[in-house]
Structure formats: C-alpha cells, structure tokens
Amino acid sequence: MPGHQPDRALFYDVNRTSIRVWQWGDPSQPVVLFIHGGFDHGRMFDELAPRVAALGYHAVAVDARGHGDSGRLTSGTTWLTQVLDFALLARHLGAPVGIVAHSMGGGQALTLAGAFPDLVRWIVNIDGLGPPAEVMVDPDDPATAMNENLERALRIVRRPPREWESLEAMADQRGRINVRLPREWLLHLAAHGSAPGPSGGRVWKSDPIFTIDLPSPFGYEQLLAQHRRVTCPVLVLTGDEPDTWNEVHGDELQRRIANIPDARLVHVPGTGHYVHIEDPDSTMRAMEAFVGEVGP
C-alpha cells in the first residue's frame, strides 16, 4: 500500500527551471535524495521515503524535469540536463547526499556520482544499471542514432497528449506495462502522475520528449567507463521475476556490478523491476544493512 503523505511539498528554482520536491523527516538530518525513473514521479517513494526518514534522515523525493510537477524540457537532452539538476539540488540541500534511485534514475545517479564524487555519500540503485548493450548507441554509426532520435522527436512534438477518460483507465494502461504492480499502486501513480485534460479527462504529466535520447545517450563502453569513475559505495537491488523493464541479467549483470569499484548486489526474491514497491520490507532490510556497513 502507498505509505505516508509527505511532510512538506516545495519547489526549488534549479538550473533555470522549477523542481518539485517532496520531503519527509527533519531537514537538519543527513539528506537522502530519491530519484525516480522514466514516466514516473517522486510520489512513487511514498512508502520507502518515510521509512528512511524514520531512521534519522531528511528524505527528499524529486520530480525530475519533464515529470510530475517540475518544469518542462525544452529539448531532448534529458540525461545530462537532469543530472545537472540533481547535482545543483544536492548542493542546495546539503551535499554530500545519499541517493536512492530507480531505473533511469539509478543510471543518472551513477553518472552524477562519477562526475561529482564530492556530492554523493552512497547510492542504492534499484534495477538501474542501464539497458542491454544491444539497444545502446552503436559506436560505429552514431549518425544513424542521431537521425533516428531527431525523427522520433519530430513525431513526439507533433502529437498532442492523449487524454484518458478516468484515473481507472490510466491505471489499466500502466498495469499492462508494469504487470507486477498492485492495483492500489497503479491508481496512486496515476493520480499523482496526471493532470486534468482539456476535455474533462486526464493527461499524463510526464513529457514524452524526454525519451528521445533513450534508452541511453551513450554507447556501451562509454557507459562502463562512466561507472568505473564511481568511487562511493553502491548497493544494487534487483528482482528475480520477469518484468517489462528488468532487462539486465546473469553474466551481464555481474559484469556491470564488477565494473563499479565499490558495488555489491542483493537479489530480492519474488520481485521484478519495482523492487521497492513490490517488497518494501526486504528493500529496507537491505538498505539498513548497507548503510550499517558504509556509514550514514
């Protein structure tokens, strides 16, 4: 079930836009920044963030640029723009911060830690080590990738947002994609991830322009090189159940873990891509053990 309402909901002016943050706990305590994945928003951490705050942290969940209530994107240079947003937000909140990040947010947390090691104490990466190598940019043909992204961007900006008749219909759509999420969570994510539409229905808040440099703006070897720069402790949480988005498994998962200098892996049985929603108790146990090992 979705957990406690945030204690505070604020906006910060960051990197020439307005970033929505949701806060739990005492602002004088060490900061843990929660970063969601693509098409999601900060309220996906309504169960996990208050539990982390109860351990003596200031838990801050962010709506990434182009998602939730935060400012929109002006182009598709999503990855690095959002990483810069998170870096500036971390400095404002009181770096170094701990980071809990899911999916795309997990990859961005690693990019952030590799580029700005002074900003990050540790990372809990929830199924966010990147997509399979075969869908990344081909280093031998980057021009084709650029052209494909531009063609896709043109289609996106020409297409009006789809308006859904109800939250229930939006939850149904998410349920077809995120097949393991409970119904109450599908409704929760739809309620906080949508806004009234022009014809009395609902539209998703996430701006699809963010997808034009996905699944990754980087080639495979460049991604590994970035991860090798991460010096802070990293806990990677993955599920063992088939899901739409948990696409890195087996030997490839082990290779990516071994490539990060101070990483450790915990499998959470019976979960898929949304480990922290499907099994928050096991997620918290793994986090507490990790923080007990590496420090607050």
Regions inferred by a protein language model and the residue ranges of each:
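Alpha/beta-hydrolase fold catalytic core
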Residues: M1-V32, A54-Y57, G94-P96, G130, ...
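Active-site loop/oxyanion-hole signature of alpha/beta-hydrolase fold enzymes
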Residues: Y12-T17, A54, A64-V100, M136-P142, ...
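Conserved alpha/beta-hydrolase catalytic His-Asp/Glu region
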Residues: R158-P217
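Catalytic histidine-centered segment of alpha/beta-hydrolase-like enzymes
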Residues: V268-P280
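Post-His helix in hydrolase/transferase enzymes
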Residues: I277-A289
